[in-house]
């Protein structure tokens, strides 16, 4: 007879990204990251929301986003669901659901605000320490994504983002810091989310500003 049902140790879980959930985009030492500049118009139609032109970043959009850091309506990643300040109550709800694993990403700019800082931001590390400790206290395993699109904005403006080996070096240092400081709290690691996003959504995936590139397609390839 065919067995049905799930194995006893099957991991029922949930997932989110730091940029989608945390908010608090300049709180406790966090630096600006690339997702903080993603524009959204609440009046867009369903079709407009998926248009490639609205998902791409250009110089005009980039400068406009930096010029108004108080605009939360058109830059929703800046506030998310305020998970950074309300994670305890959200975690209680996760536990009520009976989930056994939580996949969330770690925000690079919360650990190294500029990406190339000499020392990590201790407030950022403490946030993830407390969150992951609480997950385990609720019997929830931690599945941590090291990079879910967003990188510190400084790495884009100073070095050109993923086109530069400097950004790769900073990523390695960031990753090593996570392993050293959070390694005993994380059950599973994922180095990159949707590695192929660089092709179908270049600003998300590899943080390119389209009209700053002489050869856009070649720049995407170089980043990947």
Please provide the spans of the model-predicted regions.
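Active-site region of glycoside hydrolase catalytic domains
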Residues: 2-71, 95-96, 114-116, 125-224
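Active-site mouth loops of central-metabolism enzymes
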Residues: 72-86, 161-166
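A generic structural signal for short
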Residues: 78-79, 119-120, 219
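Internal amphipathic alpha-helical repeat/solenoid segments
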Residues: 80-91, 113, 124
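Catalytic domains of carbohydrate-active enzymes, especially glycoside hydrolases
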Residues: 86-107
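Glycine-rich, proline-tolerant flexible connector loops at the mouths of alpha/beta enzymes
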Residues: 106-120
């Amino acid at each position: 007879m065919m067995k049905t049902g799930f194995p006893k140790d099957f991991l029922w879980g949930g997932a989110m990204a730091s940029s989608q959930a945390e908010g608090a985009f300049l709180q406790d030492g966090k630096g600006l990251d690339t997702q903080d500049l993603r524009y959204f118009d609440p009046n867009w139609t369903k079709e407009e929301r998926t248009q490639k032109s609205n998902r791409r970043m250009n110089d005009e959009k980039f400068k406009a986003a930096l010029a108004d850091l108080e605009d939360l309506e058109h830059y929703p990643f800046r506030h998310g669901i305020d998970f950074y300040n309300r994670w305890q109550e959200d975690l209680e709800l996760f536990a009520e659901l009976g989930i056994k694993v939580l996949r969330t990403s770690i925000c690079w700019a919360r650990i190294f605000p500029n990406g190339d800082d000499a020392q990590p931001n201790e407030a950022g590390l403490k946030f993830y320490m407390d969150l992951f400790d609480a997950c385990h206290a609720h019997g929830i395993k931690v599945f941590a994504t090291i990079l879910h699109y967003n990188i510190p904005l400084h790495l884009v403006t100073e070095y050109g983002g993923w086109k530069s080996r400097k950004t790769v070096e900073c990523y390695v240092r960031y990753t090593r810091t996570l392993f050293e400081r959070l390694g005993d709290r994380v059950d599973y690691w994922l180095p990159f989310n949707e590695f192929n996003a660089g092709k179908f959504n270049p600003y998300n995936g590899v943080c390119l500003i389209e009209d700053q590139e002489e050869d856009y397609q070649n720049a995407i390839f170089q980043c990947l």
